[in-house]
């Protein structure tokens, strides 16, 4: 089979033959429904279809490292670009971080090359080798070690495949007369024997049931490399050739390809899917690190955690921040800060009036207590309110706990509001590109050249970089303990924030012919100042990382 046709790859070069010879042999082959075991058949369909996403199939932890990397030219990473969908700038120190952006087609080629390298040693059918590699998370060394430890039967049993060196029961069953009808054990309809197919385990079902079974497993359950034989209690895995032979829908084939290649990518610590929706590119690095990489689609992200590039905050703290924003922890803080528990039945109570004489509404409790000290109401007297229990230890502890919750809530809201404000402003600044483009056209109509008006685009680029940096500085500051270095950081942050707001104001003004030169000078001066202050802030934070100057609040 020609390896350039579709995505069928032949591993045994000694068995290659011409198209005419192979075509003649296929006509004479009595088992023409069984594909050549030396071929890894992943279908002859387009590998990348923009309209079909894989959703959550890319979630998971990376593990191991495969050796099937190619020799493509590498390009410089990150840098200081930023705007569009990047979410953050690259740090100037990261210019040496080299990476390449691969298509899903190239990833498939890397995967096939990995299988080829292993097969040169163990000499198994390609589809069996692929299942073995998947079992070991595409770690070739671990597979080789287990393969030659002398217990092959145990290895194949763990991987849920039949030892290919044994005679196939399925091929023995294929010798039965094709004229004899037999019932399918799934749909119980009678078909000729030629309409049945099965795996090496010997279980056979009609092709219609096979197709529906595989389609359900792939499209609805998201299973690719772990589809087992449909026979009850049989755990033998379905190989790639069988899947591609029995499925006719190109979308199902495409989804299956994504599932298989996704396993390869997620088990390789040097590969990472681009997190942009409907993007099927993969970034390949020389070594894994928390550095910015940019996909061909324009998305810039952190290779380590997959989030938008988030300098100056580290991945660990950003992960905690995102979780804090997503879960109900701050709802609990609000309840703790604005409500109290009944001292008797512990039901949560919110005060809705000025009187501190509280009566629990729980019909089984109805305790009366003081809102201030949480003590019984009776000792307070009935003539007028006069709480005389401020100094008791239990009341003091209750008030202290409430104050701590209230302070924690206020602190969180302070940083969260500023974080969200810069995030919202960043979205608005992206829309500013269209407005700036119109302004640039207007300025060219006032006798300014195309080169002369490029300062506006540069200013918007810098503005977006500064917004993204400021957004993540509030995450960094939330977990930062107060010390002399944190004061310097906050001063740098305030200076950059003020300059960024001024630059944003300049860009949103209407530009008239009278103020053209004046506003150009102001914009250029301000975006250069913003660039400088942003650089100073990031250099200070990274210097703190290198010298271990930062102390953190464990949340």
Swiss-Prot record:
Q: Where is this region: Ariadne domain?
A: 406-555
Q: In which pathway does it act?
A: Protein modification; protein ubiquitination
Q: Where is the composition biased (Acidic residues)?
A: 1-47
The record's listing under CDD domains reads: BRcat_RBR_HHARI-like, Rcat_RBR_HHARI-like, RING-HC_RBR_HHARI
Does Repeat show up as a keyword for this record? Answer: yes
Chain positions found as N6-acetyllysine = 140
Notes on how activity is controlled: Autoinhibited by the ariadne domain, which masks the second RING-type zinc finger that contains the active site and inhibits the E3 activity. Inhibition is relieved upon binding to neddylated cullin-RING ubiquitin ligase complexes, which activate the E3 ligase activity of ARIH1.
Binding locations of Zn(2+) 6: 370, 373, 380, 387
Region annotation TRIAD supradomain: where it falls in the sequence? 180-391
Q: What is known of its domains?
A: Members of the RBR family are atypical E3 ligases. They interact with the E2 conjugating enzyme UBE2L3 and function like HECT-type E3 enzymes: they bind E2s via the first RING-type zinc finger, but require an obligate trans-thiolation step during the ubiquitin transfer, requiring a conserved active site Cys residue in the second RING-type zinc finger. The active site probably forms a thioester intermediate with ubiquitin taken from the active-site cysteine of the E2 before ultimately transferring it to a Lys residue on the substrate.
Q: How does it assemble?
A: Interacts (via the first RING-type zinc finger) with UBE2L3. Associates with cullin-RING ubiquitin ligase (CRL) complexes containing CUL1, CUL2 and CUL3. Interacts with neddylated CUL1. Interacts with neddylated CUL2. Interacts with neddylated CUL3. Interacts with neddylated CUL4A.
What is the name of the protein in this document? E3 ubiquitin-protein ligase ARIH1
- Record organism: Bos taurus
Which classification does the entry list for the species?
Eukaryota, Metazoa, Chordata, Craniata, Vertebrata
Gene name, please? ARIH1
